[in-house]
């Protein structure tokens, strides 16, 4: 069984979502519940044609429990579920989504498979983001709208000057808050 590990949302200064956990699924197979392995193989291949027929056949015959596919899309989960196969087990897990990853990837960072922050804001505020006694989200001083405008201008400047990379920092001089931080 997969453990569910929750993590708080990260928001910008205006309450715009930067990062959130969602429940996603892995598909596993419990072979003792598969009645007709040939039919099962054909049905699964219709939904997941990228799977190796040979490996799937081998796993069905040699394994008691194996992963069919990790990190299913919603469409894949729905189609597999609609097959009505009792041998397909859906294991929930918490996946971290970053709706504005193109704007914040260097700043927000990422988490590992066990939901521990390994870089950026995710690492620095790891303890706070995992504190289940307080459901308040982490609100940053960053502004998504300003971040977008500055990123666009920085990209244009990189093109004009044929630069390999660039960075920008916008800080409120009165209080020290970071409004935008970009690295390209």
Positions of predicted regions on the chain:
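A short, well-structured edge-of-sheet supersecondary motif
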Residues: 6-16, 162-184
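Soluble non-cytosolic domains of exported or imported proteins
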Residues: 5, 34-38, 70-74, 115, ...
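Short beta->alpha transition motifs characteristic of CBS
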Residues: 21-26, 111-112, 180-184
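Conserved, well-ordered alpha-helix/loop/beta-strand core segments that scaffold catalytic motifs
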Residues: 129-166, 171
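Small/polar-residue-rich segments within soluble enzyme cores
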Residues: 46, 58-136, 140
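Juxtamembrane extramembrane loops of integral membrane proteins
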Residues: 4-48
């Amino acid at each position: 069984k997969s453990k569910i590990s929750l993590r708080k949302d990260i928001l910008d200064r205006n309450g715009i979502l930067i990062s959130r956990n969602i429940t996603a699924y892995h598909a596993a197979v419990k072979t003792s519940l598969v009645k007709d392995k040939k039919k099962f193989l054909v049905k699964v291949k219709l939904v997941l044609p990228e799977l190796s027929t040979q490996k799937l056949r081998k796993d069905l015959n040699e394994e008691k429990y194996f992963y069919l596919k990790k990190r299913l899309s919603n469409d894949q989960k729905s189609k597999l579920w609609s097959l009505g196969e009792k041998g397909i087990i859906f294991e929930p897990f918490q996946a971290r989504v970053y709706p504005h990853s193109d704007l914040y990837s260097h700043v927000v960072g990422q988490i590992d498979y066990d939901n521990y922050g390994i870089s950026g804001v995710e690492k620095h505020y790891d303890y706070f983001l995992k504190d289940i006694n307080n459901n308040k989200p982490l609100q940053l001083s960053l502004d998504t709208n300003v971040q977008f405008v500055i990123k666009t201008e920085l990209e244009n400047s990189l093109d004009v000057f044929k630069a390999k990379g660039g960075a920008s920092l916008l800080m409120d001089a009165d209080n020290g808050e970071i409004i935008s931080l970009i690295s390209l």
